[in-house]
Design a protein with these regions (language model features):
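Secreted, periplasmic, or luminal enzymes acting at the cell surface/secretory milieu
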Residues: 1-25, 92-226
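Hydrophobic helix-and-loop "lid/oligomerization" segment in the mid-to-C-terminal part
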Residues: 9-104
């Protein structure tokens, strides 16, 4: 079942189709498409919903002020969640999105970005457990657009917030947590790993020099897998 159009916003659809027929709009009503998807979900053991952006929403000269999923897709996810079936969201997007609500609704999220011609096979391998996902996020996912810029290892200036020593006069959001929803380097697996015995070739880094780090990585789970350090 299709479930929803990428967006029901005619202005965005017109923009995406300005130079090419990039997005095809289903003429059925949003509720009709949702009803069809819910009927299929009720007959399923697990619901897999593919959501995200059209490719034209994330390329050059395609900035967005709202980085949540389009409302049409959010309505679909809410309806699928209401069925009570396990819900897996497959994300196709070209930028970090604000997914606070979806994080609460989904039992699992698989980030695929914009995959190539064999993307469908690769996604199926992960979903069916034939391949163990091992990727980590190359960028942080904010909780909302108001957190941008949020990135790993940024320079704390002024009076940065310390959660262990809260103070009224420190830099923080009072309506949201300070950290990102998914930080740089975040990623789950069907197994678990432990990292130990971290050693450095030198305690100092000379100008134009290098330092080599070594670690011991152990698969502590019951499935084969790989990870990124």
């Amino acid at each position: 079942a299709k479930g929803a159009n990428v967006t029901d916003d005619k202005g965005i659809v017109d923009f995406l189709n300005l130079y090419e027929n990039a997005v095809q709009v289903d003429p059925r009503s949003p509720q009709e498409m949702i009803d069809e998807a819910v009927a299929a979900a009720k007959q399923s053991d697990v619901v897999v919903a593919v959501v995200g952006e059209a490719q034209g929403m994330a390329h050059e000269a395609s900035s967005r002020t709202d980085i949540t999923l389009p409302q049409s897709q959010r309505n679909l996810i809410a309806a699928l969640k209401a069925t009570g079936k396990p819900l897996v969201l497959v994300l196709m997007n070209g930028r970090p999105l604000a997914l606070v609500k979806e994080d609460q609704q989904a039992d699992a999220l698989l980030e695929t970005w914009f995959a190539g011609t064999e993307g469908g096979h690769a996604i199926a391998d992960v979903l069916f457990g034939d391949y163990n996902p091992s990727g980590k996020l190359p960028m942080s996912f904010p909780r909302s657009v108001g957190q941008i810029p949020t990135y790993y290892s940024h320079l704390n200036t002024g009076r940065p917030y310390n959660p262990e020593k809260p103070n009224k006069y420190t830099s923080r959001y009072f309506d949201e947590a300070n950290g990102p929803l998914y930080p740089f380097g975040y990623g789950l697996s069907y197994t678990t790993f432990s990292v130990s015995d971290v050693t450095m070739s030198s305690a100092t880094l000379p100008r134009d020099g290098s330092v080599t780090a070594s670690v011991q990585v152990t698969n502590t789970g019951k499935r084969e897998g790989a990870t990124v350090i």
